[in-house]
Amino acid sequence: MYKTKCLREKLVLFLKIFFPILIYQFANYSASFVDTAMTGQYNTMDLAGVSMATSIWNPFFTFLTGIVSALVPIIGHHLGRGKKEEVASDFYQFIYLALGLSVVLLGMVLFLAPIILNHIGLEAAVAAVAVRYLWFLSIGIIPLLLFSVIRSLLDSLGLTKLSMYLMLLLLPLNSGFNYLLIYGAFGVPELGGAGAGLGTSLAYWVLLGISVLVLFKQEKLKALHLEKRIPLNMDKIKEGVRLGLPIGGTVFAEVAIFSVVGLIMAKFSPLIIASHQSAMNFSSLMYAFPMSISSAMAIVVSYEVGAKRFDDAKTYIGLGRWTALIFAAFTLTFLYIFRGNVASLYGNDPKFIDLTVRFLTYSLFFQLADTFAAPLQGILRGYKDTVIPFYLGLLGYWGVAIPVRTLFDSLTDFGAYSYWIGLIISLIVSGALYRWRLTVIMKRFESLAKSKC
């Protein structure tokens, strides 16, 4: 990160940060995409099982990665204030925090997942695949969270290209392990859909090993003296949790509502479950665009706010939101035109493809809503405003999606589509609430700046 003097320099810096994050996010979401697509080609029953498993996994995993992502604004503020010597200490505290959170998530997966999956009305075969998938996936919890901390460090330092290069390794690693374990190639035991969970875990262990080597060999990081182990500092841990818990909670509130919808849909046939999850899976892949802008906004805004250059932060906000709209125009057009081709990536059954196309059409609307809402979350994180957005997210997602879904399900014959309508309206409401909060925060900082003149 560095100080910029004009709009052109800001645009160049923003795009330099944004594009590597975008490629990184695509690679990150590709793990779930590869698991779902390759399992769908195996058979529909296993796809339904993996779909149910990811509905449980995603909220808790994103909650914990959201907590450790608090490292980005913390380091951003240090750099903006010229306190680079504080970076290593915060990095190690988040490593310790990630290890503790890994143990919590591991226990939840091993003990709670089977109870939930066996009591929501799933067919026995589908539930069995889901449980085995989660058990295999739990092997990779530690490297998943530790890599998230390393990535947050690199991103906050502006080394987003390095994060991108590391994450690009995930797709070939995950695809290779999945091919061996799902289909039983080259004498490896055929595990079906559950093998996708083990494939993802193995891929992340390899990725973590490579990341640690890079961390200590990268010339630009040697000035941080990361080789010096820093002991546990509970005050810094508490600061990280204080800032990270609302971030994780906000992400959890959004992701969990999608997952709850997926679990409620257990009452439908395996075909509908598989079609719903396939459409949702590809929509998650497309979410990489607004999510990347959100991450980039958190980096640049936190840096400028830390340096007390509030007008520069405001300029970046405008750049980020326009970038989101431009990319949305391209991605939504692409999905609308090629939604039939997208559906065929997940299976060959004509009924399955037709149903998935319908779900993908609904997904266009909540992807548009995400274009407005997601960048606002990153901007608010850049201002270190996380608590109020958490409650706004709870209100917007949970206070709207479920009641609207229930209303449409009871009064219309929309069936499974009622769930998607509820999600779309909840995203629109959440985006409006985040925009209101940003207006309040920006006025507060502008008043603070004027009072010090």
Curated annotation (Swiss-Prot):
Superkingdom as given in the UniProt entry: Bacteria
GO cellular component: plasma membrane
Keywords: Antiport, Cell membrane, Ion transport, Membrane, Transmembrane, Transmembrane helix, Transport
One family name in Pfam for this protein: MatE
Membrane-crossing residue ranges in chain numbering: 12-34, 54-76, 96-118, 128-150, 162-184, 194-216, 243-265, 285-307, 319-338, 358-380, 387-404, 414-436
Membrane topology: Multi-pass membrane protein
Gene Ontology biological process terms, A to Z: monoatomic ion transport
Coiled coil regions, renumbered to chain: none
InterPro entries noted in UniProt: MATE_fam (IPR002528), MATE_MdtK (IPR050222), MdtK-like (IPR048279)
Record GO terms (molecular function): antiporter activity; xenobiotic transmembrane transporter activity
Subcellular location: Cell membrane
Alphabetical list of PANTHER family matching this protein: FMN_FAD EXPORTER YEEO-RELATED, MULTIDRUG RESISTANCE PROTEIN NORM-RELATED
Protein family according to the UniProt entry: Belongs to the multi antimicrobial extrusion (MATE) (TC 2.A.66.1) family.
Free-text function comment from the UniProt entry: Multidrug efflux pump.
Protein name: Probable multidrug resistance protein NorM
Organism: Streptococcus pneumoniae serotype 4 (strain ATCC BAA-334 / TIGR4)
Record lineage: Bacteria, Bacillati, Bacillota, Bacilli, Lactobacillales
